């Protein structure tokens, strides 16, 4: 990839509306709006929210509702789901929700779709999802697309009102090869979760590009890659701030998802060598550092992945540090 091509790589924001230890969900929502407005000023292209359930430290479970809230408080940044876990929902309801959002905020809504539960099995059952729901994802996706663009006579069909005839860009999200291949075969844009599945990143992207078939949506493959970046004014501060993110994943490894914890001086006082290895393996794509470190590592990441767009996740305990992180990332990318 040439420098000119990399210059054109867009930056976007992934937000899980983190709830910090001692904080409130209301504060999380206010911070999410603040970040969206500033991200728009800093030149980020999209702002996506992710569906997760029964996780005390993640407040974006009612994803479509939050998308409407964020879109209503911003002016031009694209807002969408990164993603909606389609097997948790009726395709009809998702078509109606996103048809409504696109009608309210025309030309600004994205519908990113995944097939994972976004939660544990007990919560999945509470969502009325059965254990094999993900296997039906291609059929459910086709059903959803037909609600937006029905084929044939619609007189005797169930219709999505609003939704029918509305152009909502659909993305497929994934952390393995299944969605990569499906996105390629359908000619849809693909977003890969390198921020928690780094080992599968390059193989999945190659599979997507190799299986790509031009469609009425895309003439060429378009790949967005998610990555966690913790940026600060110095390498030392960034490393300190990143310990909140490490603790987040350590809690997941231990099966005890929690609110986002404050940074610590020494992670080795908290995790075992085995846990450290597990977290570091899962977060091996994470970029942590000051401006120059972030710039160099992000350029290498784009060169390796050939990404058309980068979706940045940046979680720190203090909201001001998170805002500064996103500001630094935007600044070094714009001025490289």
From Swiss-Prot:
<dbReference type="InterPro" id="IPR050766">
    <property type="entry name" value="Bact_Lucif_Oxidored"/>
</dbReference>
<dbReference type="GO" id="GO:0016705">
    <property type="term" value="F:oxidoreductase activity, acting on paired donors, with incorporation or reduction of molecular oxygen"/>
</dbReference>
<dbReference type="InterPro" id="IPR036661">
    <property type="entry name" value="Luciferase-like_sf"/>
</dbReference>
<dbReference type="InterPro" id="IPR019949">
    <property type="entry name" value="CmoO-like"/>
</dbReference>
<dbReference type="Pfam" id="PF00296">
    <property type="entry name" value="Bac_luciferase"/>
</dbReference>
<dbReference type="InterPro" id="IPR011251">
    <property type="entry name" value="Luciferase-like_dom"/>
</dbReference>
<protein>
    <recommendedName>
        <fullName>Uncharacterized protein YvbT</fullName>
    </recommendedName>
</protein>
<comment type="similarity">
    <text>To bacterial alkanal monooxygenase alpha and beta chains.</text>
</comment>
<dbReference type="GO" id="GO:0005829">
    <property type="term" value="C:cytosol"/>
</dbReference>
